[in-house]
């Protein structure tokens, strides 16, 4: 899974985390370009679209075209372990895994930035919006900074020292078209003073992440543009932020487009304490939630062989 934005880093900062993951298997054979999703299982499989609307199918279609591969059929199996429509980069993770699995089956060198670019375009074709931050984190792993907003993707990994994370996901019914809705509420114009403040917050976020400056990081996690517009759509937003801070979190943010939230701490022990406070926040708010302590995860991994 991945968590994007991290406060003031809207659409340009994301981190891969080990709380949840997807798995994709592909089998390539001679054929005429058919891509068939033969199996979907896992704890969140019931919310996965079927047919051509499935992100895995679309990602493989685009990958075959990008690699100029013809005369093959592809059978796909998806194990869906990331909650759907929860702000955890689930569709992007599936797309990245599918493309990487195809590359492995074809014994082609793994170009992680190219994978991210194709996966982002697959998301755009299915959901209307690419999320290059999420897919880049899923492909490269770690915490990533986007240096471009469209393909070819330019990105850098940033080493994250002494940080642990708490991922909290309220158990609510997935909202169809949620990401599009959450983008519509974002302001389209800004006063110059707000733009400058937003830029300063992004500077603080990057400085804090790069150098481990907790004070700067705390400031950078407090967005002044996107989060204020979205917060009213996030269950228990204010109480989760408040309780997490009481537990010792550096700060808490909406993960992607929500409804999940991400709290950042300075150690695993501190994360466990914050997780306890976040669980209490949802209880006091009257909402069931799954709360997990997470570490930074590596990028997509490929295994070649097996039964496909």
Language-model segments: what does each one mean?
Residues 209-308:
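Glycine-rich, charge-dense phosphate/pyrophosphate-binding loop(s)
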Residues 37-39, 73-78, 110-122, 200, ...:
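Beta-strand segments within the central parallel beta-sheet cores of soluble alpha/beta enzyme folds
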Residues 88-112, 117, 139-141:
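DPxDG-like acidic metal-binding loop motif
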Residues 54-64, 202, 240-243, 277-278:
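Short, well-ordered amphipathic alpha-helical segments that serve as non-catalytic structural scaffolds
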Residues 32-36, 179, 269-275:
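Short, conserved charged micro-motifs
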Residues 112-162, 252-254, 258:
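Alpha/beta catalytic cores of group-transfer enzymes, especially the acyltransferase/condensing modules
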């Amino acid at each position: 899974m991945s968590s994007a934005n991290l406060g003031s880093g809207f659409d340009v900062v994301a981190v891969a985390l080990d709380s949840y993951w997807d798995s994709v298997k592909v089998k390539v054979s001679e054929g005429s370009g058919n891509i068939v999703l033969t199996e979907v299982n896992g704890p969140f499989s019931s919310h996965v679209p079927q047919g051509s609307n499935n992100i895995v199918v679309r990602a493989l279609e685009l990958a075959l075209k990008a690699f100029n591969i013809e005369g093959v059929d592809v059978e796909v199996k998806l194990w869906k372990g990331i909650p759907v429509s929860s702000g955890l980069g689930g569709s992007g993770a599936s797309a990245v895994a599918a493309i990487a699995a195809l590359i492995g089956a074809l014994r082609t060198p793994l170009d992680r930035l190219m994978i991210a670019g194709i996966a982002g375009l697959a998301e755009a074709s299915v959901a209307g919006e690419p999320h290059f931050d999420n897919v880049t984190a899923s492909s490269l792993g770690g915490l990533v900074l986007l240096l471009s907003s469209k393909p070819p993707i330019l990105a850098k990994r940033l080493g994250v020292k002494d940080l642990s994370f708490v991922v909290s996901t309220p158990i609510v019914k997935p909202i169809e078209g949620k990401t599009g809705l959450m983008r519509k509420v974002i302001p389209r114009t800004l006063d110059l003073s707000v733009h400058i403040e937003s830029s300063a917050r992004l500077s603080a976020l990057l400085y804090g992440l790069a150098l481990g400056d907790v004070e700067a990081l705390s400031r950078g996690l407090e967005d002044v543009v996107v989060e204020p517009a979205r917060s009213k759509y996030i269950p228990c937003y204010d109480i989760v932020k408040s309780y997490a801070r009481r537990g010792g979190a550096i700060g808490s943010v909406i993960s992607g487009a929500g409804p999940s939230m991400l709290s950042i701490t300075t150690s695993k022990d501190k994360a466990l304490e914050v997780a306890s406070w976040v669980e209490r926040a949802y209880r006091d708010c009257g909402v069931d939630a799954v709360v997990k302590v997470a570490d930074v995860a590596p990028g997509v991994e490929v295994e070649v062989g097996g039964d496909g």
